[in-house]
Amino acid sequence: MTETPIAPQEVPRVIVLVPAYKEVDSLPRVLEALRAQTRPADRVIVTLDPHTDSRRTAELERVARAGGAEVWHSVGNRHKKAGNLNGALSRLLPVVSDQDAILVQDADTFLDPQFIEVTRRKMAQGYGAVGGTFRGRSGGRLCGAFQRNEFARYARDTARKKGKVLCLTGTACLFRAGALKEVLEARRSGLLPPAEGVYDTKALTEDNELTLALKHLHHRIVAPTRATMTTEVMETWPALAKQRLRWKRGALENLIDYGLTRYTTEGWARQLVAFLGASVSTAYLVSVVWFLAVGAGVRIAPFWIAFTAFYAIERAVTVKSRGWRVSIASMLVLPEWFYDLFLQGVHLRALADTALRRDRAW
């Protein structure tokens, strides 16, 4: 099929790509949220990866067309979301203007009405890519509640830093088409790590890797406070551990691929801080268990009482956007602390898997 080139226009277009595989339940609301945008997209394309159950693929196509979207099908894709997007972008990029914007969003993420308007306005200020912050959907019981608190703290931290982020979110992000074309060319020329397309299908976290690629081509990125959305949470602890292991190992491997540069320094520093934090927590737990085992008992020093009080207040203040009930519940130190320990344990596992070159899968 031959695409008709889009003639340059005064107002750049916004084209949405929604890669989908099995999201039959969420896709209708995704498309509804896109139709409700204060600055509607000029074009919405749902790009389908064939499911092993052909009925599910057919249902996704029906839902997409009913929601007013175009439907594309990936062909011969073996690399999940990244491969699906690479195939779609290989069709799309040659026929769009460099100033057009391409919004890539997950098929289980619901954009708030102002998302496109806010990100498009920000991109007009010279940014190569504009992301956002997200809230967690309901569900998942205690596991989901911790994630919703975590997302609220991330949004608060991003707002405090005026949109500065280490990594663009893969849930929804607006890219300047010209920036993606530069990434593709830089991969071919060897200026960036080689890949089969815009997204590196070898990376566990393709969104993190693309962020590094854009930065190394000197594109600015940002996540405006008002660019918000709602996305899924992992509903079980094993699912959360699997997700975070992929995120943490993928981020570490991306840093290794790019080495130590002006754009990776902060990432390496965060890796070091996370490792030190996990090490201190491990040492603390081991020492407590040891003292209890030998019958020495545990004496709580005034310093630790003060530190615990500070931790409780910090936990409450950083989730106040979720309401006073959540803030009060967050002051229960032990549940929040155990969630931190859980994430630190996953981080140590990611370090070990990377060092030992264990199989990479998700």
Please tell me what each predicted stretch does.
Residues 12-15, 43, 209:
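Cell-envelope/extracellular polymer assembly enzymes that use nucleotide-activated donors
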Residues 32-41:
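Short, acidic, metal-binding catalytic loop of nucleotide-sugar glycosyltransferases
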Residues 42-52, 72-74:
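Short beta-strand/loop segment that forms part of the nucleotide-sugar
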Residues 75, 80-97, 113-203, 245, ...:
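Long helical/loop segments within the catalytic core of UDP-sugar-dependent glycosyltransferases
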Residues 95-110:
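Short beta-strand-to-loop acidic/aromatic patch adjacent to the donor-nucleotide binding site
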Residues 150-155, 241-261, 312-314, 346-352:
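Catalytic core of nucleotide-sugar-dependent glycosyltransferases
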Residues 208-229:
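Catalytic donor-sugar/metal-binding loop of nucleotide-sugar-dependent glycosyltransferases
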Residues 272-358:
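Membrane-embedded multi-pass helical conduit in multi-pass membrane proteins
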